[in-house]
Structure formats: structure tokens, C-alpha cells
Amino acid sequence: MWRNSEERENRTSGRSQGSYQEIIGRTWIFRGAHRGRVNKKNIVWHELIGLKVRVVNSTHPGYVGIEGYVIDETRNMLVIAGENKVWKVPKDVCIFEFETWDGTKIKISGEKLVGRPEMRLKKRWRK
């Protein structure tokens, strides 16, 4: 009955554990992504997947300095792939610096990014 018990112990609910492992070290796949429409005014409403990101400040010192490309986004977290590791970073405790395709750097608080990407479009923001 429990033939595959070893495999079951190592599994997580939802996604498989190794779902991001094949991306490690292959960050070149995001370099060709055309993200020319992202600027400081519309980054809150824009898709973040594929953008280069760096954690500038955080309440947790372990998150400061994480750098890589955003490969997934959930309501409260960004999944960032670096050169040799994948990090899951909470949005609400960090300040991020995104780099656009032309090299401009946009610094934004993670509290403004909390929420699913499709729901952020519906929010109204003060300018």
C-alpha cells in the first residue's frame, strides 16, 4: 500500500519540490524579454516576472542583498532565481530595486506590491 513512501515524504503540497531547480543558473532566458513599458509610474500595475530585482532593505537581515530575476509571483511573495539558488522573499517586509531593460533602476516598497498581480490592476493608487 505504501510503495512510494520515500517519494511522498519529500513532496510538498501544491507544486513539486523541484519545480524551480531547472531554472538555477539559466537566468539568461530572461534577458531577451521585452519589458520596455515598465517605468516608475506604472510598475505597480505591471507584470514583474522576468525583471531583474535586488532586495535593498528588509526587516530581516537575511533577505538584504538577494539579487536575481523574478520567476514567480504570489500574493505575498516573490520567487527570485539567482545564479545558484532560488529564494522566496515576502513582499511586505522588503524594499526592492527593479532594473528595467534600459538599465534604469526603480526602488519601490514591497507593501505597494502586496496582492496578486491581476488584483493590483483593480486598486486605485494615489500619485
Swiss-Prot record:
Gene Ontology CC annotations of this record: cytoplasm; ribonuclease MRP complex; ribonuclease P complex
Record-listed E.C. numbers: 3.1.26.5
First-listed, main subcellular location of the protein, grouped into a coarse class: cytoplasm
GO molecular function: ribonuclease P activity; ribonuclease P RNA binding
Biological process according to GO: rRNA processing; tRNA 5'-leader removal
Subcellular location: Cytoplasm
Entry-linked Pfam families: RNase_P-MRP_p29
Keywords: Cytoplasm, Endonuclease, Hydrolase, Nuclease, tRNA processing
Matching InterPro entries: RNase_P/MRP_Rpp29-subunit, RNase_P/MRP_Rpp29_sf, RNP1, Rof/RNase_P-like, Rpp29/RNP1
Protein origin, superkingdom: Archaea
Catalytically driven reaction(s): Endonucleolytic cleavage of RNA, removing 5'-extranucleotides from tRNA precursor
Family annotation (NCBIfam families): RNaseP1Mthb
Entry text on domains: Interaction with Rnp4 is mediated by the N-terminus; short deletion mutants are still able to reconstitute RNase P activity.
Described purpose of this protein according to its UniProt entry: Part of ribonuclease P, a protein complex that generates mature tRNA molecules by cleaving their 5'-ends. The RNA is catalytic, but its KM for pre-tRNA is 170-fold decreased in the presence of the 4 known protein subunits (Rnp1-4). The protein subunits also decrease the amount of Mg(2+) needed for activity.
Subunit structure: Consists of a catalytic RNA component and at least 4 protein subunits. Forms a subcomplex with Rnp4 which stimulates the catalytic RNA.
Family per record: Belongs to the eukaryotic/archaeal RNase P protein component 1 family.
Protein's name according to its UniProt entry: Ribonuclease P protein component 1
Protein's organism: Pyrococcus furiosus (strain ATCC 43587 / DSM 3638 / JCM 8422 / Vc1)
Upper classification of the organism: Archaea, Methanobacteriati, Methanobacteriota, Thermococci, Thermococcales
